[in-house]
């Protein structure tokens, strides 16, 4: 049980992450869980209920003990790093909103991550997936939703969270999808006709009325579709057709990039289409025109027809 003043700070921090930093709900929930774990450990470490003063005066020994505890509890290096990033983020917020200055936590480096290469699917596996994903859903509109969503991800390289945020407003531009990705960075991706046509067909039979700003991909109860629900459909597909274990919604984003590269697209254009943080929107379109991006996309992409 947290002190009410601490909980109030956490609530303000969460609002800040959503409204000011444009963090996704998934990231905010993960960060909140990491901070909660840290504060629970602090409570155990100090043998008393955590106060604001405990948080402000946490020393390097406490923080390293918490990281060691996570390691002993078999958290992955990635999870430990994310946890430390979450807590640092909270302390950075405290610096902005309280009298806290230059906390010791910022001197602690994240553990080195093992770099894993992203796993793409073969083009044959992608074709099998796109041809058979409609077999799952039990209701026609759900089956068409699954296919439209999967084609959209593979045809545009969107993150699953980005794809699930598509609204009717995105469909009004006949040529491009304008996406606000991580860190509020904007990128523009050419619409592939097959993706847009499937989405249009899906919306024609969707049994729920939606406003222009509402996400178009819905669950069976009419609420916004969540990533785990869609990935469960992919698990069924994967098991039935003997597809690779690493097949997930995100693997189609990796496949988008890999297949473009294999078909002659240059790395820089692919990075721009993916919206990687190393390239800002301004850099994207001062150095490479939208016309060039479209040309690269339409000449190199394997399912353009």
UniProtKB/Swiss-Prot annotation:
Chain ranges of the Tyr recombinase domain: 116-298
Localization per record: Cytoplasm
Top-level taxonomic group: Bacteria
Any one GO CC term of the record: cytoplasm
Keyword check for tRNA processing: no
Free-text function comment from the UniProt entry: Site-specific tyrosine recombinase, which acts by catalyzing the cutting and rejoining of the recombining DNA molecules. The XerC-XerD complex is essential to convert dimers of the bacterial chromosome into monomers to permit their segregation at cell division. It also contributes to the segregational stability of plasmids.
Keyword Cell division included in the entry's annotation: yes
Protein name stated in the entry: Tyrosine recombinase XerC
Example GO biological process: DNA transposition
Family: Belongs to the 'phage' integrase family. XerC subfamily.
Molecular function GO labels: DNA binding; tyrosine-based site-specific recombinase activity
Domain annotation Core-binding (CB): ranges: 4-95
Description of how the protein assembles with itself and partners: Forms a cyclic heterotetrameric complex composed of two molecules of XerC and two molecules of XerD.
Gene of this entry: xerC
Primary site of residence: cytoplasm
Cited PANTHER family: PHAGE INTEGRASE-RELATED (PTHR30349), TYROSINE RECOMBINASE XERD (PTHR30349:SF90)
């Amino acid at each position: 049980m947290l002190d009410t003043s601490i909980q109030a700070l956490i609530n303000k921090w969460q609002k800040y992450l959503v409204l000011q930093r444009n963090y996704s709900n998934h990231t905010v929930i993960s960060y909140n869980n990491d901070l909660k774990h840290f504060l629970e450990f602090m409570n155990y470490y100090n043998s008393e209920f955590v106060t604001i003063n405990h948080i402000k005066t946490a020393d390097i020994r406490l923080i390293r003990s918490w990281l060691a505890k996570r390691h002993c509890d078999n958290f992955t290096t990635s999870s430990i790093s994310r946890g430390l990033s979450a807590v640092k983020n909270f302390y950075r917020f405290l610096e902005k909103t309280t009298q806290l200055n230059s906390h010791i936590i910022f001197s602690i480096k994240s553990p080195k991550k093992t770099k894993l290469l992203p796993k793409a699917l073969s083009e044959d596996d992608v074709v099998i997936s796109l041809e058979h994903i409609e077999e799952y859903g039990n209701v026609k509109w759900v089956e068409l939703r699954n296919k439209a969503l999967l084609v959209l991800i593979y045809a545009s390289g969107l993150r699953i969270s980005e794809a699930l945020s598509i609204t009717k407003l995105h469909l009004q531009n006949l040529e491009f999808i304008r996406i606000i990705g991580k860190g509020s960075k904007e990128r523009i991706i050419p619409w592939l006709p097959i993706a847009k046509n499937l989405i249009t067909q899906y919306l024609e039979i969707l049994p729920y009325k939606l406003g222009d700003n509402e996400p178009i991909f819905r669950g069976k109860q009419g609420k916004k579709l969540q990533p785990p629900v869609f990935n469960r459909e992919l698990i069924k597909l994967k098991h039935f057709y003997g597809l690779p274990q690493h097949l997930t919604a995100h693997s189609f984003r990796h496949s988008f990039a890999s297949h473009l590269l294999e078909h002659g697209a240059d790395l820089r254009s692919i990075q721009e289409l993916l919206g990687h943080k190393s390239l800002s929107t301004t850099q994207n379109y001062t150095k490479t025109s939208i016309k060039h991006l479209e040309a690269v996309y339409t000449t190199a992409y394997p399912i353009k027809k």
